[in-house]
Amino acid sequence: MIKPKIALTIAGTDPTGGAGVMADLKSFHSCGVYGMGVVTSIVAQNTLGVQHIHNLNHQWVDEQLDSVFNDTLPHAIKTGMIATADTMETIRHYLMQHESIPYVIDPVMLAKSGDSLMDNNTKQNLQHTLLPLADVVTPNLPEAEEITGLTIDSEEKIMQAGRIFINEIGSKGVIIKGGHSNDADIAKDYLFTKEGVQTFENERFKTKHTHGTGCTFSAVITAELAKGRPLFEAVHKAKKFISMSIQYTPEIGRGRGPVNHFAYLKKEGLDDELSK
């Protein structure tokens, strides 16, 4: 029997399954990798917004990470919601011990509803602790603005932001997602590495049901990196995956509903291919 590749997510929860650890694990499964999850925050949220956040003590996060790393090693790691500086330092300790494992950061700062998920001190700490360790960071436009301090209102500003991530912050790669731009028809993303810039375009679907798209997108990249895919291929797969998951959204809940984490699998019938 061939052992599956393992992807680890370190993030907050969503009891409705649209975002956070729950969305990551479903995305990992759809990509044919074995998912593991460490919880940083218990978040009471649904499609209508975030009601309550209970951040776990960093020692509890450490205990979970210790349980994982004392038993097995993941082939790729992603972090999502990290609400305190102490928890960032805890995660950094494990990443520094395993620098060869691909690491993806989804810098979760705002929920789709607009609710803030990270205080200003923690946002500043992110730049010095985790971003320099990342193989790829996946900010949307508002998150890229928060991190770089720029007002990103043009393609030129996107290019400037990408250079800040690579040349000043020290991330190996960053994909700045253009889904929050005002373009009515096309969603354009920009992948920056030391080698240059590559762009990805896809149709923008007219739906409000996009809860958890950032989590899902970064989770698919993580799964593909766990399988040994090059970064460009991982991002290309994630773009196809997220487009289909939005196109076939299940329309759950009374607000901004989740995407369909199994649409790619079911539509294409790629169960075997995805597990390769």
From Swiss-Prot:
| Membership in a protein family | Belongs to the ThiD family.
Look up the record and name the pathway of this protein: Cofactor biosynthesis; thiamine diphosphate biosynthesis; 4-amino-2-methyl-5-diphosphomethylpyrimidine from 5-amino-1-(5-phospho-D-ribosyl)imidazole: step 2/3; Cofactor biosynthesis; thiamine diphosphate biosynthesis; 4-amino-2-methyl-5-diphosphomethylpyrimidine from 5-amino-1-(5-phospho-D-ribosyl)imidazole: step 3/3
User: Pfam families annotated for this entry?
Assistant: Phos_pyr_kin
Q: What is this protein called?
A: Hydroxymethylpyrimidine/phosphomethylpyrimidine kinase
Q: What is its EC number?
A: 2.7.1.49, 2.7.4.7
A GO CC annotation recorded here is: cytosol
- Quote the catalytic activity from the record: 4-amino-5-hydroxymethyl-2-methylpyrimidine + ATP = 4-amino-2-methyl-5-(phosphooxymethyl)pyrimidine + ADP + H(+); 4-amino-2-methyl-5-(phosphooxymethyl)pyrimidine + ATP = 4-amino-2-methyl-5-(diphosphooxymethyl)pyrimidine + ADP
GO molecular function per UniProt: ATP binding; hydroxymethylpyrimidine kinase activity; phosphomethylpyrimidine kinase activity
What keyword terms does UniProt attach to this protein? ATP-binding, Kinase, Nucleotide-binding, Thiamine biosynthesis, Transferase
Tell whether Transferase is among the UniProt keywords: yes
Keyword flag Transferase? yes
- Give an example GO biological process: thiamine diphosphate biosynthetic process
Record: residues binding 4-amino-5-hydroxymethyl-2-methylpyrimidine: Q45
Q: Which superkingdom, per the lineage?
A: Bacteria
Question: What does this gene product do?
Answer: Catalyzes the phosphorylation of hydroxymethylpyrimidine phosphate (HMP-P) to HMP-PP, and of HMP to HMP-P.
